[in-house]
């Protein structure tokens, strides 16, 4: 049986993550408050950020930037700004 969480990003109930995907207190916060759907959305944004900004995950500053963007996206209802990207219209 999957667990349900109230997703802080989507502001609705949904299936929670199966396990903690990120270490530490932030990982626990994500596990307890973010749904699978919101996490999948974040992963797509994360890939775009890494590619467009040419981030190197071996570089501490780049990891910190990505973490800051993740917190902003998941918990502060922020959007990820990617230069030159226009989301498809619905």
UniProtKB/Swiss-Prot annotation:
Gene3D superfamilies: Fe(II) trafficking protein YggX. SUPFAM superfamilies: YggX-like. The keyword ATP-binding does not apply. One of its GO terms (molecular function) is iron ion binding. GO terms for cellular component: cytosol. One of its GO terms (biological process) is cellular response to oxidative stress. Keywords: Iron. Transmembrane segments: none annotated. InterPro entries: Fe_traffick_prot_YggX, Fe_traffick_prot_YggX_sf. Pfam families: Iron_traffic. Belongs to the Fe(2+)-trafficking protein family. PANTHER family: FE(2+)-TRAFFICKING PROTEIN-RELATED. Could be a mediator in iron transactions between iron acquisition and iron-requiring processes, such as synthesis and/or repair of Fe-S clusters in biosynthetic enzymes. This is Probable Fe(2+)-trafficking protein. It comes from Aeromonas hydrophila subsp. hydrophila (strain ATCC 7966 / DSM 30187 / BCRC 13018 / CCUG 14551 / JCM 1027 / KCTC 2358 / NCIMB 9240 / NCTC 8049). The lineage of its organism: Bacteria, Pseudomonadati, Pseudomonadota, Gammaproteobacteria, Aeromonadales.
